[in-house]
């Protein structure tokens, strides 16, 4: 009885090795008989390949020299030419008449675990030809009575888990006369692919062996034989099949080979069979690789490479402050010293960790000041104009009488007060005297930071160390390279194994907050690949590409020598896809009108029709958030739409100004003087009361000390700049939403099958044509729909909501459940709250995030000319709870309700065999439009490549399968751009116009987002060359090629002149 334990590949290998040992012993015993020519044999119709005098009921005997000690393997190679010529020269024996049918013989199969296979079902006597005809296959092109050569017989293996792990061995030959001919569709004839060398196996084994399967689990090698392992199901039973793959034509002719094999070329040396010969290309590539490595190593050893992984160190302070360096050099807190990052700092009346309040590039938030000790000794940091300044003050007595601050002609000098100077943490209205400028204005970090003045008092003590420089050296003149510190600046924070680096320190690698520094050639080559275009980049590309080319050459030659090129091609390139013959074919059809496919008859989607009953639901006008503003290089006196008419657009400014719950703010940036008149900081206190005494305005006036005023460049340092922003929720006259209800919806797909038109629906998904029956997997109908026709600024867009709303449940406040007017005059929802305006600097880390609900961010933009600055406005989503808003419509609707998420599945039943390939080339011209992570499908369209169906994936996510040609589908995107699209092989990048969930809202939410136009732009030659480096490179290459061509022409003319008129 057969064992019930499942067979494994290890058991298969052991069975093959045991059988090979038995055959080697059998061949060694009969080696002398194999060398003698055999007499002609009579063909027996019942055995179809066995000797006439052999007992078919006994154990099977393998034919052919398959021992490991033989030089030739006749089981898969033709006889030598001399033997073939000798056999042709002999007179063929007369062919006897066909013998009458004989009783069937037991099959020549055995189990892998020593058990016996079940006896086959009894049936009519068959030979290979009759068995092929009985299976419905056409007869071969050659004479079926011709004796098949014994070396044509090969062995394949078959086992099933449902058969109790019975392991079958099937003996067959690929053809009866040499290489089989190709069928009309370019595949091998199935009648010639399976002709058993013995009686017909059991019927269920034959069905399992002939079951089409296009997937391969693995490629296996046994000696010089190659097998393909497949896993499939037949009638609910899982089968495993190990197919022998043909290597070359059996008769030695030059007939075409199957698609999954390649020509075998001998690459072994006659003297050393194990060696593989290489030619000049391999030697050249190896030399090129060594040269690139040598040059890259030499360049890496000249100077250390630094991998910048963090923002660079703050720029140095101006040279004008260096004169104070000698006074307080020993008291300066530098980066990396104790008590800086890990110390406890005093902020107002509280003590906080330094990491919580330390301002600078290293923490997000606004700038501020902190104290290292008590209030008698204050140390402060200020950031202005992209530079950091340290200000130290020692033992300042309390102020006696405050004295207004007198401003000098520029920011580098200041007047000295007449009384005793006050400490830095005096009141806001107190003045500080005796300070030397250089710190400038600042902004607070915390609300409790009220004891720090708006101006930092104290001496400007900016430390000026020499810049850090490295060098590379060797120990005793031998590798490896070491990094030596020539000069070190403490604030750079370079450390070696956790210890701060000093001049003279030697270390394999230095680490700092800015990145890593090393002299290693390997690290230098790696850094060269990541840097911008340079010679190191080219060398790194050669070093990375050439080894793979050499590896490919080595594997290709080695695999061709071993006869496994078919397996390597199958695994690496496209997978082994045997011919799939059957009565059913399944493919996909995209859902855009005009899509076509082959199944195998041409099928085209002529159109899609949507049928429903429509009920009008009225019209309404939604709220809309609008914002505008201006960047002005002075302080305006009339802050209104009329007073700022030269800077702000008139139409949106008037609409926002007349709206309800508007937010209007004017920020004064670094305003110290205007028109030559001195002004105090209190002139722009929060609320702007002092400013409004002289300039009446309806907007809030806020100071913006510490923000960069570089947008208005071309001024002395005592200039001012103001930013004006205006935002509110308004009812736009050109934005309306009309509601329509659709019931009893149904989608009708109009197909053209080989010229025959038919319509399919969910009730009737079949098409009966003269070529066969087509069954379509139609997606379900969407059901009841709600259509929102959104008109805005002359453009119309329809959004669809699935299902009927539950007006007595959670959808009670939705626009569908409201009573709308036919003329769109009703404004839906309550009046929203006023938006919040915020001035954000251009280098603020806050810009890396998105604005919050109901927030509007304004940022000055530097112009290309003096006195010209712009404004960039960003707005977040709606900041109120009302759901009658455009973003509610986008979140609860879709752009196309009846558009299915995937393609149509087509199952075509026909009488002729069909084979459907699969495309591997990347799709072309793919465009992605919509949003991601928003619950609404995005539109994906492009061109599928030829060669079969394209199983499209976007960033690794399966979208569907499409035939060659144009496709249009909808997919839920979970990742942001860029998007890599692929059909299963090579990938390509798609163009995308998508928005994130925060930006998904009614079109035209922010009417700001504009920049004040600049009359002209200027560009230097260096900037132009940097922007057109690729064209310049190609032009230089073409110029060199043209110069070489002209030189060749000149040389030819020179020799031609000498030939015509020799001297």
UniProtKB/Swiss-Prot annotation:
Bridged cysteine pairs (disulfide): 153-197, 590-595, 619-824, 641-653, 699-712, 758-767, 807-817, 931-934, 950-983
GO cellular component: host cell Golgi membrane; host cell mitochondrion; membrane; T=4 icosahedral viral capsid; viral envelope; viral nucleocapsid; virion membrane
Ranges of compositional bias, category Pro residues: 93-107
Molecular function GO terms recorded: metal ion binding; RNA binding
Keyword annotations from UniProtKB, A to Z: Calcium, Capsid protein, Clathrin-mediated endocytosis of virus by host, Disulfide bond, Fusion of virus membrane with host endosomal membrane, Fusion of virus membrane with host membrane, Glycoprotein, Host cytoplasm, Host Golgi apparatus, Host membrane, Host mitochondrion, Host-virus interaction, Lipoprotein, Membrane, Metal-binding, Palmitate, Phosphoprotein, RNA-binding, T=4 icosahedral capsid protein, Transmembrane, Transmembrane helix, Viral attachment to host cell, Viral envelope protein, Viral penetration into host cytoplasm, Virion, Virus endocytosis by host, Virus entry into host cell
InterPro entries found in the cross-reference section: Rubella_Capsid, Rubella_Capsid_sf, Rubella_E1, Rubella_E1_1, Rubella_E1_2, Rubella_E1_3, Rubella_E2
PTMs per UniProt: Structural polyprotein: Specific enzymatic cleavages in vivo yield mature proteins. Two signal peptidase-mediated cleavages within the polyprotein produce the structural proteins capsid, E2, and E1. The E2 signal peptide remains attached to the C-terminus of the capsid protein after cleavage by the signal peptidase. Another signal peptide at E2 C-terminus directs E1 to the ER, with a similar mechanism.
Extracellular side: 301-534, 583-1028, 1050-1063
Superkingdom of origin: Viruses
Biased composition (Basic and acidic residues): 70-87
Protein's recorded name: Structural polyprotein
Native species: Rubella virus (strain BRD1) (RUBV)
């Amino acid at each position: 009885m057969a064992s019930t334990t499942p067979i494994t590949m290890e058991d298969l290998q052991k069975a093959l090795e045991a059988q090979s040992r038995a055959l080697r012993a059998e061949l060694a015993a009969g080696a002398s008989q194999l060398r003698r020519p055999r007499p002609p044999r009579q063909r027996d119709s019942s055995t179809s390949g066995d000797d006439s005098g052999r007992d078919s009921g006994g154990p099977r005997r393998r034919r052919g020299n398959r021992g490991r000690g033989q030089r030739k393997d006749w089981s898969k190679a033709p006889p030598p030419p001399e033997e073939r010529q000798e056999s042709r020269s002999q007179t063929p024996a007369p062919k006897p008449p066909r013998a009458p049918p004989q009783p069937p013989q037991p099959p020549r199969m055995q189990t892998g675990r020593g058990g016996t296979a079940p006896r086959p079902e009894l049936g009519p006597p068959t030979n290979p030809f009759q068995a092929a005809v009985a299976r419905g296959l056409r007869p071969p092109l050659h004479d079926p009575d011709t004796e098949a050569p014994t070396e044509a017989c090969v062995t394949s293996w078959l086992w099933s888990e449902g058969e109790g792990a019975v392991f079958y061995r099937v003996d067959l030959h690929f053809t009866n006369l040499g290489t089989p001919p190709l069928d009309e569709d370019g595949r091998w004839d199935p009648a010639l692919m399976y002709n058993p060398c013995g009686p017909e196996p059991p019927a269920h084994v034959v069905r399992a062996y002939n079951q089409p399967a296009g997937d391969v689990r693995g490629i296996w090698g046994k000696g010089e034989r190659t097998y393909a392992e497949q896993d499939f199901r037949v009638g609910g039973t899982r089968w495993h099949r190990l197919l022998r793959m043909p290597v070359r034509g059996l008769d030695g002719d030059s007939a075409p080979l199957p698609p999954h094999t390649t020509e075998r070329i001998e690459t072994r040396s006659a003297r050393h069979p194990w060696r593989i010969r290489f030619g000049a290309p391999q030697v050249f590539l190896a030399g090129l690789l060594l040269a690139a490595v040598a040059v890259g190593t030499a360049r890496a050893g000249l100077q250390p490479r630094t991998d910048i992984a963090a923002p660079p160190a703050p720029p140095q302070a101006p040279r004008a402050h260096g004169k104070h360096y000698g006074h307080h050099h020993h008291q300066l807190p530098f980066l990396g010293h104790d008590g800086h990052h890990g110390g406890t700092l005093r902020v107002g009346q509280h003590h906080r960790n330094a990491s919580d309040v330390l301002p600078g590039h290293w923490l997000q938030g606004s700038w501020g000041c902190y104290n290292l000790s008590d209030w008698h000794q204050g140390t402060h940091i200020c950031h202005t104009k992209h530079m950091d300044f340290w200000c130290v003050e020692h033992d300042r007595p309390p102020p006696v009488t405050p004295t207004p601050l007198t401003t000098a002609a520029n920011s580098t000098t200041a007047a000295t007060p007449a009384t005793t100077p006050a400490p830095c943490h005096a009141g806001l209205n107190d003045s500080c005297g005796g300070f030397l400028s250089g710190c400038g204005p600042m902004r607070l970090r915390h609300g409790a930071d009220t004891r720090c003045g708006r101006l930092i008092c104290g001496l400007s003590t900016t430390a000026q160390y020499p810049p850090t420089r490295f060098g590379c050296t060797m120990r005793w003149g031998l590798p490896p390279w070491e990094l030596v510190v020539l000069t070190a600046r403490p604030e750079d924070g370079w450390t070696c194994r956790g210890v701060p680096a000093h001049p003279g320190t030697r270390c394999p690698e230095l680490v700092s907050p800015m990145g890593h520094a090393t002299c290693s050639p390997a690290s230098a080559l790696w850094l060269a690949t990541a840097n911008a275009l340079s010679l190191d980049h080219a060398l790194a590309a050669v070093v990375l590409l050439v080894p793979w080319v050499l590896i490919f050459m080595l594997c290709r030659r080695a695999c061709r020598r071993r006869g496994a090129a078919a397996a390597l091609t199958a695994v690496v390139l496209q997978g082994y896809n045997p011919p799939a013959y059957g009565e059913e074919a399944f493919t996909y059809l995209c859902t855009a009108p005009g899509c076509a496919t082959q199944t195998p008859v041409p099928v085209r989607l002529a159109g899609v029709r949507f049928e429903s009953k429509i009920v009008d639901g009225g019209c309404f006008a939604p709220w809309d958030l609008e914002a505008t503003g201006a960047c002005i290089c002075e302080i305006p006196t009339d802050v209104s739409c009329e007073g700022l008419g030269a800077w702000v657009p008139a139409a949106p400014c008037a609409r926002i100004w007349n709206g309800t719950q508007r937010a209007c703010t004017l920020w004064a940036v670094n305003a110290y003087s205007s028109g030559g008149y001195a002004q105090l900081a209190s002139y722009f206190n929060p609320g702007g009361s002092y400013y409004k005494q002289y300039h009446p305005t309806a907007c809030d006036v806020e100071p913006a000390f510490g923000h960069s005023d570089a947008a208005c460049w071309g001024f002395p340092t005592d200039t001012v700049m103001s930013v004006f922003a205006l935002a509110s929720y308004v009812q736009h006259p050109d934005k309306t939403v009309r509601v329509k209800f659709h019931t009893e919806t149904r989608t009708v797909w109009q197909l053209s099958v080989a010229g025959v038109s038919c319509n399919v629906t969910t009730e009737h998904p079949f098409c009966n044509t003269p070529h066969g029956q087509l069954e379509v997997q139609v997606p379900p109908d969407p059901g009841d729909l709600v259509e929102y026709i959104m008109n805005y600024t002359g453009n119309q867009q329809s959004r669809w909501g699935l299902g009927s709303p539950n007006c007595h449940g959670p959808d009670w406040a939705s626009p569908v459940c409201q009573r709308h007017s036919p003329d769109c005059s009703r404004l839906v929802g309550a009046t929203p709250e006023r938006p919040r305006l915020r001035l954000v600097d251009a280098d603020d880390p806050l810009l890396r995030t998105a604005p919050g609900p109901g927030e509007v961010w304004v940022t000055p933009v530097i112009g290309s000319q003096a006195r010209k600055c712009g404004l960039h406005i960003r707005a977040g989503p709606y900041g109120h709870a009302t759901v009658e808003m455009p973003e509610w419509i986008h979140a609860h609707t879709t752009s196309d309700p009846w558009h299915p998420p995937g393609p149509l599945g087509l199952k075509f039943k026909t009488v002729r065999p069909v084979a459907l390939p699969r495309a591997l080339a990347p799709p072309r011209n793919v465009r992605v439009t919509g949003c991601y992570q928003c619950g609404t499908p995005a539109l994906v369209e492009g061109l599928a490549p030829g060669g079969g169906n394209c199983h499209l994936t976007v960033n690794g996510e399966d979208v569907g399968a499409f035939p060659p040609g144009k496709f249009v589908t909808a997919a839920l995107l979970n990742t942001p751009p860029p998007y890599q699209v692929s059909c299963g092989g090579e990938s390509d990048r798609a163009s995308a116009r998508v928005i994130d969930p925060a930006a998904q809202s009614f079109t035209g939410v922010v009417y700001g987002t504009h920049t004040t136009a600049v009359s002209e732009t200027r560009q230097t030659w260096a900037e132009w060359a940097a922007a057109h480096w690729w064209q310049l490179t190609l032009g230089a290459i073409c110029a060199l090629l043209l110069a070489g061509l002209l030189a060749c022409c000149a040389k030819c003319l020179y020799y031609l002149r000498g030939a015509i008129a020799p001297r």
